Structure formats: C-alpha cells, structure tokens
Amino acid sequence: MAELPMIISVDDHIVEPADTWTSRMPAKFKEAAPHIVRKDMPDVTFVGGKLTVNEGGGGAPADWWIYEKLQRPLLRVDSAVGVPRDEVTMKGVTYEDMRPGSYSQKERLEDMDENHIEASLCFPTFPRFCGQTFTEAEDKELALLCVKAYNDYQVEEWCAGTGGRLIPLIIVPLWDAHLAAEEVRRNAERGVRAVCFSEIPAYLGLPSIHDPDNYWDPFFAACDETSTIVNMHIGSSSKMPSTSPDAPAAVGSSLTHINAELSMTDFLLSGLFERFANLKVAYSEGQIGWIPHLLHRMDVVWEDNRGWGGVADKVPNPPSSYFKDHVYGCFFDDPNGLRLIDEIGEDNITYESDYPHSDSTWPRTRQIAEKQMAGLTDEQRYKVVRGNAIRLFGLDFT
C-alpha cells in the first residue's frame, strides 16, 4: 500500500481575529461593527440543542464579540485542539487561551504541516456557519458591509500568500437572494469557488428551497454559472437535533448527521438539479454511512408515491440519479461509511480534520485516516483524502 497522500481538509474553522471587521469598516460604522471586549464570563449551558449564556457576573475573563444586541463569548469548544478532553467545556476563553493556529495564518500552516494537511477550507465562527449572525441583524446596511468585510478578510488576509493551502470560503447576505448572487459573482471574479449556505434555510425564517416563487434562484444561478460550490455545515440551520429541551448535549452531538440527511432529501427532491445542471452541494461534518439507505428510500418514495408525492413534475428521474453529479459527503470518523464506499461512490466522498473544534482529529489525522482507510485501494484513498476535493473546488494541486 502506498503512503497516504497529503490530505485536503474540506471542513476546518477560523476564529476571526479581533480586528476582522473594525479594520475594514467605513468610519461611520467602526463603533457599530463587531468588536471584542474582555470581561468576566458567567456560566454557559448547552442543553436541548440550545446554547445559553446565563446572566450574572463573576467567572474568569473571556473575550466577547459585541455586535448590536448580541454578546457572544469565545468558548473553549471554539478552540479545543491541544486541550485535554476533560477540559474541553463551554467555558469562556481569551485569544491567549487558544492555540494560535485557531486565528493566526502562520501558526495554522504550521499545525497543518504537523497534521499531514496540505490544504484547508475554513468555516467562520462569529458569523456562524453560513452568516446567520448578519442575517439576524437589524441594520442591514451594516450587515451587508460585515458580510463583504468577512469575505475580503478571507481572500486578502487569511488565504493570501499561502499558495492555495488555505481555500477561501465566503458568506452571503441570505436575507436578499439577489444581493447573495452579486456577492457570489464578486468573489468568483477573484477566484473564489466556495460559498456557505444553510442546510435548512426555513429554520432561519427564510424561504425554503421549495419556495413556489423560486426565491433562491438568483443565488443558485450565480453558483451554477460560476462553478461555486454550495457548502453546508451541520448546524448552519441554527437548529441542532435533539430529543427534548432537557436532553444533555451528548444526545444532540450524536445526532448531528440528521441535519445533513434532512437537507440532502430536500435538495434531491427539489428539482434544483434539473434546472441548474452545474450546481453542486457539499455537506460538511455530516459523515457518510447514512447515504445509501436515504438514496434507496427516496427512490422508493419517488416511484411508489408519484401520484401524491408532489415531485413527479419537477424530479423526472430517480432522486439517487442526481447524487453522483451534484452531491458530496464529508467525514472525519465513519468506518461504517467507508465499508459502503461502493454504494456511496468513491468520487463523492471528501475528508476533514475539523480543526480546531472538539471533534478535531489534529494532530493525528494522518494516523486515523490510515487506520480507517486500510481496506481501501490506493486510488480510493487518494480520491477521498484529496483527489475529490481538488476536482470539486478546482484546486491547483495534483
């Protein structure tokens, strides 16, 4: 068996530096832009899939993002690499408490070298996984400037000068599909091929992808025309799965793949891939073992319930037939999924390290990948750990 190729991780994260927005805002918006304040941290709970910052002072100092009415502390779970598992909690932290690779380009590249990672696609933290923070904001003029500032930071600072090792991933103003399309095209002109989107936009109070007025068509058309990949991270609907309001966090964490299942069902039964032949979607951190069953079930429903299922007119072919050309799964720990690689398709699977989150396999991503993929051929391993990502995002690697 050949040596494991250098990995391209399509799901990592960046903790934005404190001046990400203040350094890029027009003078009249500098004070209102997201900024960091250091203050004591009260208790934080994560129960029933909901994060709650409890009222009251006390506690150790933490760095807080302040933006409109939002006060959001940096948390240990935002940057958990290098920390013993028992110390990875919901407590607040400062930048000095975090591993520098969480927010600094130089140290991130060094940590990637240590982890056998050649290139990395990073999702945002303060904006949340698809820019929900700005979608929920009251001042939409400022919010649009914040979206553009974040994208400028991604392209001009975070990814700049890395020889393609850090792959730009932008956010868009989801509250206006036409503005979102403009932002996709603005960034495509400077080489960006990846955009964040919500796995289930209806959960955000936005139109669903089944909207009868085709609300999202301008956005999807822009992605289709520019070959921009639509990336959906678990939790990008701001609603994590859980079983009850008092269920412990471990329940929801064990069920995170469900959001990806819901979303993929939505897309494959939407007719979007009929109307946008070049549209491609990628699911981040959803794992892959569930894919064969879901494809089979959708095909059965499509065939047996075509009289009343509501999709016969817009999905003329079995839903599974659209998967190969349009949908990509991603995993960091799914040995069961790898045993189903022939059913899923070796060309539709990508890999991740999830740096610097608590699920991250850093600094042992290579060793874990080698163990998980021991039953794959050299060609399959190449495709999973880098080849499919190169093809999907048009990366300048071999």
Walk through the language-model features, giving the residues of each.
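Conserved residues at the C-terminal ends of beta-strands
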Residues: V10, E16, F123, S198
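Short aromatic-enriched loop/helix-cap "lid" or pocket-rim segments at secondary-structure transitions
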Residues: D19-T22, T133-T135, I209, S242-P245, ...
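Catalytic pocket-lining loop regions of alpha/beta-barrel enzymes
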Residues: L142-A143, W158-C159, G164-I167, V172-H178, ...
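Mid-to-C-terminal alpha-helical segments outside catalytic/metal-binding sites
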Residues: A2-I8, P17-K91, Y95-A119, L145, ...
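Surface-exposed, active-site-proximal loop segments in enzymatic domains
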Residues: E87-E96, R128-L142, H178
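Substrate-binding cleft and catalytic face of glycoside hydrolase catalytic domains
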Residues: L121-E136, G161-R165, A180
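Histidine-centered catalytic micro-motifs
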Residues: S9-V15, V230-G235
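Short glycine-enriched loops at secondary-structure junctions
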Residues: F123-R128, I234-K239, Y355-S358
